[in-house]
UniProtKB/Swiss-Prot annotation:
This is Protein CRT10. Keywords: Phosphoprotein, Transcription, Transcription regulation. Present with 125 molecules/cell in log phase SD medium. GO terms for biological process: nonfunctional rRNA decay. Residues 695-719 are annotated as: Disordered. Residues 697-710 have a biased composition (Acidic residues). Induction: By DNA damage and hydroxyurea (HU). The modification Phosphoserine is found at residue 704. It comes from the Eukaryota. The keyword Cell wall biogenesis/degradation does not apply. It comes from Saccharomyces cerevisiae (strain ATCC 204508 / S288c) (Baker's yeast). The lineage of its organism: Eukaryota, Fungi, Dikarya, Ascomycota, Saccharomycotina. Component of a cullin-RING ligase (CRL) composed of 4 subunits: the RING protein HRT1, the cullin RTT101, a linker protein MMS1, and the substrate receptor CRT10. Interacts with MMS1. The keyword Kinase does not apply. Substrate targeting component of a cullin-RING-based E3 ubiquitin-protein ligase complex RTT101(MMS1-CRT10). RTT101(MMS1-CRT10) may regulate nucleotide synthesis through transcriptional regulation of RNR genes encoding ribonucleotide reductases.
Length: 957
């Protein structure tokens, strides 16, 4: 009997599932990162009982026989792509720039691996210098600065090397740098024209109000307004983060302290006092060497624990301030915008987190039809959270949106809109992947999804974009393989070309021939002899042309599902026969944009994955035995664990103390269940999600192995360790990746359900009912991710580490370098559609946000701060990394030693970055100047500046 295939009666999600290598089955486990179960259990991924999910989604990676489209499908897709090209060529062919760009793309592909960054004969690191035409790439030039403005800042004077978030911001010609318990204020204009450093900057001390027993209220939050008298008492408080926000029609400087206090200054007031200070000194009116200026804060906020992030939004007459801290969680304060009215005391809100919150951001222009705004934050636990907020009757109401898990520390989240992306005319310019196999695979898969789900317009002259398939296919963004610069040789035998190919037959990898050692190959690579290098490579077989599905969660540690031979055979038949369904206009309703040919979907029979649904696996066996046998007393959790405490004591009416302080008792932590609105029992009763196996700890299939049994004391010890957030961080990656994929599939269903009815075949493209234009750009410790904002769906990501250190040879501590090498600095240069990402180690990558026919992605253009050295034949410019990250070493004469160690094959000149920000100079016809940005990088007591522009100036939105 021939296999059955999807038909018109299937809902869109079922069609999509059947077209993918994804299975739906039941699993039994104690560790669960299903988003709903996780929230309903109070933010614990370990449950008391074994939970059985009836619909657990897992990737079934097909073999080569599954990676092909039906010839009929290929015919339809080729016709669609041809029509789009014809649509473009009608106006692009007469354009000389278009012809030049087309020739450039063809020449680049014909060069094969010669233009691969690092690998090619030029050995250049930057993809933009090799793979982009002049009018498409950013132009970067370092501006030499003849001064070291941050001489006062000695990082070792404040406890040595410190791990902080961004400590440097710019405001016009002014800059602010956190220096211990002070904020260093500078004027760039004066710095460029005055030689004396002593009169170029001032220090703004961090102060706290000396009002009653402020320091004794450790379990309290407070707010103090500017109408209260402040006493300027310097307080030793290490600043963790600084930011500039606009609200109440003016700009403010915000600083987060290690003591849980957020200071908010009016920038204009700070600048006014600073200018008077510098004017008096420059004019000779003040000969004192006192560099302190005292500016009373406009507002002071306090949370219980150390705070590391803050953001503000001003909307609906209410100011919302969100503070991310190490309680862990997010505290949201709210105030009336109109200070002339009698101030209402709006109760603050605590939002939960399973680990520290290094970044929090409101989504601009996210107000919905009922007045809710959207807040986003990420956690070291490995997840991102979005939640809606609205002030009502002196209370902040919440509506939970989504959470997603990544299996890696998350450090930043940046809201974006479609206007932040630069349009490109060619697919290759989307993320600089010139491999024809990748292009064909992704475009075919997108077209297949559009046809299958009915999200396309038949008339190519009305719609130049692809449909919703652009959100259902994850783009792998290539980054330069910096490991190839290592003097010790490449880290393995496989040579994965990331941007180019060895030939035009879709080959993407090669391997070193057996007669060459890694060291021999390194000599060939660094000698620049291209012929010898290619002769040393064995080209691997071609990759498949279609359906090369890649996901963010796929790596060597991910265990794909292995179906039975019977199940796999049936699954393979579905993949091979399914494309017969794909003919244009796959909708039951009549479309006004339907192709005149009148082709419609055929009438296939129904198929159900019953065999795969009945294949149940207890994945709890994959986890640590102590985790599997963990027995928790839920009542004891409620009494002792922060994550399970009630919000009732948080939301009481505040007590108004002397000095106009607003005190809030925040002894109780926020609870995921309160935010989500459901408890675990409610979720377990949902037959679509899961069921509960009672007395599960006594089931034979769990405890049948006597070696799995643990003593009561061991369980108690494990439970105690597990409750510590640091221990939870080590446990999170065990299964977060597979559960992240499961949640991704569930969010695809939400995405399809959120489409506005009737927009599928509109010439204007599909429309989502909520947050249609919004995205998030996230950084993990080593990777970059672009997500749709709602639901949280990854659409582009880097698969490899952007700053890999595994091949680096250095005399400095490798473990220290790894700890510093987290991507926790992000600077969004909107005017140039550019994002700069950096690690404290001193490495920066300039990225470009791009869009092609409704596909939103990004590309890597430049790498800054990675200087390759040759320890065998060192040049006079070679430097050692030890003085950047360790205490300075001194020679016999007492001078700082800068002697090259003869070991470091990479030097990090911007080591120990403490912050980055930019200024922008607009186009000026009068000055005959194109718009440009200046990226400032503060590191190790020095300042570097990079001029960034494009050949045509500001990108037109």
């Amino acid at each position: 009997m021939p296999p059955q295939i999807p038909n018109e009666n299937d809902d869109l999600f079922t069609r999509w599932l059947k077209s993918r290598a994804i299975i739906q089955r039941a699993v039994s486990t104690r560790e669960c990162f299903d988003s709903e179960v996780f929230l309903a259990s109070g933010g614990w991924n370990i449950t008391n009982e074994i939970i059985t999910l009836k619909k657990y989604y897992q990737l079934k990676w097909p073999n080569s026989s599954c990676n092909s489209f039906h010839p009929k499908t290929v015919e339809f897709i080729k016709e669609r792509l041809h029509n789009l090209e014809e649509h473009d060529s009608s106006w692009k062919i007469p354009n000389p720039a278009y012809s030049f760009k087309k020739a450039f793309l063809e020449d680049t592909k014909s060069a094969f691996s010669n233009l691969e960054p690092v690998w090619g004969p030029s050995r250049l690191l930057n993809p933009a210098e090799l793979l982009l035409p002049q009018d498409e790439k950013l132009l970067v030039q370092e501006i030499p600065l003849e001064f070291a403005p941050f001489q006062y800042t000695n990082r070792f004077a404040y406890g040595g090397l410190q791990f902080k978030n961004n400590l440097f911001v710019t405001y016009g010609s002014y800059s602010f740098l956190a220096a211990g318990q002070c904020v260093e204020v500078h004027n760039f204009d004066i710095l460029l024209n005055v030689s004396s450093l002593e009169i170029c900057h001032a220090l703004l001390p961090v102060i706290i109000p000396d009002d009653g027993d402020v320091r004794n209220f450790r379990n309290s939050s407070y707010v103090k307004f500017k109408d209260t008298q402040f006493n300027s008492i310097p307080e030793l408080c290490s600043i963790n983060f600084m930011k500039i926000c606009n609200f109440m029609h003016q700009d403010f400087l915000l600083a987060c302290g290690d003591n849980g206090i957020v200071y908010i200054w009016e920038i204009n007031k700070v600048i006014k006092i600073f200018n008077k200070f510098t004017s008096d000194i420059l004019g000779g009116k003040d000969n004192s060497r006192e560099r302190y200026i005292n500016v009373d804060p406009y507002m002071v906020l306090r949370v219980e624990e150390s705070c590391w992030s803050v953001d503000v939004i001003d909307i609906n007459g209410i100011i919302y301030i969100a503070v991310g801290h190490n309680k862990p969680g997010v505290t949201v304060f709210a105030f009336d915008k109109d200070v002339k009215k009698e101030r209402r005391y709006i109760r603050p809100l605590d939002l939960p987190s399973s680990h520290n919150v290094p970044c929090v951001n409101f989504v601009p222009n996210s107000k919905d039809s009922v007045g809710y705004i959207t807040l986003s934050y990420c956690s070291i636990f490995g997840n991102v959270v979005t939640v809606k907020l609205k002030e009502h009757d002196c209370t902040i109401l919440t509506s939970f949106l989504d959470t997603q898990f990544f299996g890696d520390d998350l450090w930043t989240i940046t809201p974006l809109t479609k206007k932040d992306f630069a349009k490109v005319d060619n697919f290759e310019l989307l993320n600089l992947n010139y491999q024809d196999g990748f292009k064909e695979s992704m475009l075919y898969s997108i077209c297949r999804d559009d046809f299958l789900l009915g999200y396309y317009c038949d008339n190519a002259y009305l719609s130049g974009n692809f449909g919703i398939g652009t959100l259902l296919n994850q783009f792998q963004v290539p980054v330069t393989d910096l490991r190839l610069t290592s003097s010790a040789g490449i880290p393995d035998e496989v040579i994965p070309l990331r941007f180019t190919s060895f030939d035009r037959n879709y080959t993407t990898t090669g391997s070193i021939k057996y007669e060459y050692s890694r060291e021999d190959f390194a000599l060939i690579l660094h000698a620049g002899d291209l012929d010898d290098m290619n002769d040393a490579v064995t080209k691997n077989t071609s990759c498949e042309q279609h359906l090369h599905q890649w996901t963010f969660w796929e790596d060597s540690g991910y265990k794909h599902y292995r179906a039975t031979e019977r199940g796999f055979s049936k699954y393979k038949d579905i993949i091979n026969t399914f494309p017969q369904l794909i003919t244009p206009s796959g909708r039951n309703k009549t479309s006004q944009y339907q192709n005149t040919s009148g082709r419609k979907i055929c009438e296939p029979s129904t198929y159900k994955l019953t065999d795969l649904e009945n294949d149940i696996e207890d994945i709890s066996r994959e986890f640590n035995r102590s985790i599997r046998n963990l027995k928790m007393d839920k009542q004891r959790q409620l009494r002792t664990s922060k994550e399970f405490k009630s919000l009732s004591s948080v939301n009481h009416i505040p007590n108004i103390e002397s000095g106009n302080f607003l005190w809030y008792n925040t002894d109780a932590a926020a609870d995921w269940r309160t935010l989500f609105g459901k408890d675990l029992n409610t979720v377990l009763k949902d037959p679509e999600i899961c069921s509960l196996q009672l007395n599960s700890t006594e089931e034979d299939d769990v405890n049948s192995d006597p070696e799995n049994e643990e003593s009561g004391s061991s369980l108690t010890s494990f439970q105690r360790r597990y409750r510590d957030t640091e221990q939870r961080a080590h446990l999170k990656s065990e299964s977060q990746k597979s559960w992240g994929f499961h949640n991704y599939v569930r969010n695809v269903k939400r995405l399809l359900e959120s489409a506005v009815p009737g927009s599928e075949d509109s010439p204007l493209g599909y429309q989502l009912s909520e947050m249609h234009d919004e995205f998030f750009f996230l950084t993990t410790a080593h990777r970059l991710v672009l997500m749709k904002a709602n639901p949280l769906i990854i659409i582009s990501a880097t698969h490899h580490e952007i700053f890999p250190l595994d091949g680096v040879v250095t005399c400095a501590s490798k473990s220290l370098l790894q700890a510093l090498n987290r991507i926790n600095f992000v600077c969004h240069i909107k005017e140039l559609n550019c994002i700069a990402v950096a690690s404290q180690l001193g490495l920066i990558s300039l990225l470009r946000l791009t869009e092609y026919r409704g596909i939103y992605s990004f590309r890597q253009e430049y790498i800054l701060g990675w200087e390759v050295q040759d320890p065998v034949n060192p040049s006079p410019e070679c430097r050692c990394n030890r003085n950047l990250f360790d205490a300075p070493m001194y020679g016999a004469d007492g001078e700082s030693s800068d002697t090259y160690c003869g070991v470091c094959d990479v030097y990090f000149p911007m080591g120990d970055i403490c912050g980055l920000d930019y200024t922008y100079a607009s186009d000026s016809e009068e000055l005959k100047r194109k718009g440009y940005a200046t990226l400032y990088v503060a590191s190790r007591g020095s300042l570097r500046a990079f001029k960034i522009t494009t050949e045509h100036g500001t990108t037109q939105q």
